[in-house]
Swiss-Prot record:
Function, in words: Represses the transcription of fabB, involved in unsaturated fatty acid (UFA) biosynthesis. By controlling UFA production, FabR directly influences the physical properties of the membrane bilayer.
Localization of this protein: Cytoplasm
Gene: fabR
GO CC annotations on file: cytoplasm
Keywords for this protein: Cytoplasm, DNA-binding, Fatty acid biosynthesis, Fatty acid metabolism, Lipid biosynthesis, Lipid metabolism, Repressor, Transcription, Transcription regulation
HAMAP family: HTH_type_FabR
DNA-binding region: 33-52
Gene3D superfamilies tied to this protein: Homeodomain-like, Tetracycline Repressor, domain 2
Top-level taxonomy: Bacteria, Pseudomonadati, Pseudomonadota, Gammaproteobacteria, Enterobacterales
Name used for this protein in its record: HTH-type transcriptional repressor FabR
Organism expressing this protein natively: Citrobacter koseri (strain ATCC BAA-895 / CDC 4225-83 / SGSC4696)
UniProt keyword Transcription present: yes
Short name of one Pfam family: TetR_N
Amino acid sequence: MGVRAQQKEKTRRSLVEAAFSQLSAERSFASLSLREVAREAGIAPTSFYRHFRDVDELGLTMVDESGLMLRQLMRQARQRIAKGGSVIRTSVSTFMEFIGNNPNAFRLLLRERSGTSAAFRAAVAREIQHFIAELADYLELENHMPRAFTEAQAEAMVTIVFSAGAEALDVGAEQRRQLEERLVLQLRMIAKGAYYWYRREQEKMAHHSE
């Protein structure tokens, strides 16, 4: 990569980080102004268009980055699990770490999931689908259950995790710890339910084939 390309990438990065830093519990992406984001990144507003077509393109890049960040973290969690950690507890603590360290990235995913822009809703849905698919792959490998079961289990788990994540954004450390314990219990119940359901289906099939 040439010096000019490196500089361009660095400025693009600064714009993404500037936009993330301006999000908060009170401030959504829709309320950000191009001028403010450019000022925070240290560039002239007119220079913004060398990096992004418009503010929406910046927002879609942020959605992609948020989803990718979360998926990479969960892959790291699976590596920690491979070294002997508890699957559900390690995954939950990794997810809560993500929210603690990147609250605005998670806020963006939550808000735009049901926001007014169809492009944003589609982008968030795609990121969540990637997340579900990766979890279903892992469950299929670990639990030796058919894809239909692991996909249903993964979808239920991700729905509950995102709901708990939304709560975790606005509570203190002690409440977050309680939330984590509740989430671990709920995910274990789903995992056990999926396993017993699968066993029951297997027994039914065996019974019919006799």
